[in-house]
Amino acid sequence: ITGGTSGIGFHMAKAFLRSGAAVVITGRSEERLRLACGELNEDDHYKGRLFDLVMDNTRVDLFHDRFQKALDKVGSGGCPHIDILVNNAGVLGASMPNATEEAFDKVIDTNLKGVFFLSQLFGGYLKANKVEGNILNVGSSSCLRPATSAYTLSKWGIRGLTLGLAKSLAPYGVTVNGIAPGPTATPMLLKDGQDNITNKGNPIGRYALPEEIANMAVVLVSPMGRTIVGDMVYMTGGAATVTYDDMDYTF
């Protein structure tokens, strides 16, 4: 699970561990990884099944090394292979009219380029080793809206990439889907210290919870989701789906 130290990725890790999986979470900060693993390992049932890996989603040149490191880690825990990739890492930013080229590249490199090449690597690994598995891409309901930021452009890209990967990998027993959260109560979206999940701009009147997104992720990569292929599952509370024509949104 890339970007697993906080927010949706952290709660996905918790949900996967609760379901019995061995989990590798990645992040750029060794300290944040240590804190996240410390919190998750407070549950004794998860110990021995959780591994951390320092990885920058923009450093495509290091992906082979980092993936081999992940294989070594799970192998030391008795797992013969990795069969699920969750492309979750992402950053916001680079909106018109004030976006800089540097900010634009950071968003696209993290949210789209990194996902493309990590999926290329992982898909090749599954095919070469005849492992049936899953790729789950974390998109955004913003991919339903007109794009005026690098973030939204990147999520449009994730939507298309999910379809392409699903079609090309399905014959090899690899299931690819996307999950597209709407406004979610995570540190990336909520203001510092905000603990009120009320969101009057959302048809259900509140933000989605990362736990809700994580529970759906478990379904999509489990046998329960085997016939769901190439889909983006929108978990928005209605934002961008029943209000898709509303340009006055805050994420």
Regions found by a protein language model. Give the residues of each.
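Substrate-binding pocket helix/loop in short-chain dehydrogenase/reductase
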Residues: 95-108, 198
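Active-site helix of classical SDR
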Residues: 119, 154, 162
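Conserved glycine-rich cofactor-binding loop
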Residues: 5-6
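Short C-terminal tail/terminal secondary-structure segment
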Residues: 218, 229-251
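Conserved NAD(P)H cofactor-binding loop of Rossmann-fold oxidoreductase domains
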Residues: 88-93, 238
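Short, small/polar-rich loop/turn modules that mediate ligand/substrate recognition or access, typified
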Residues: 170, 175, 228-230
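Residue(s) in the substrate-gating loop at a strand-loop-helix junction
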Residues: 140
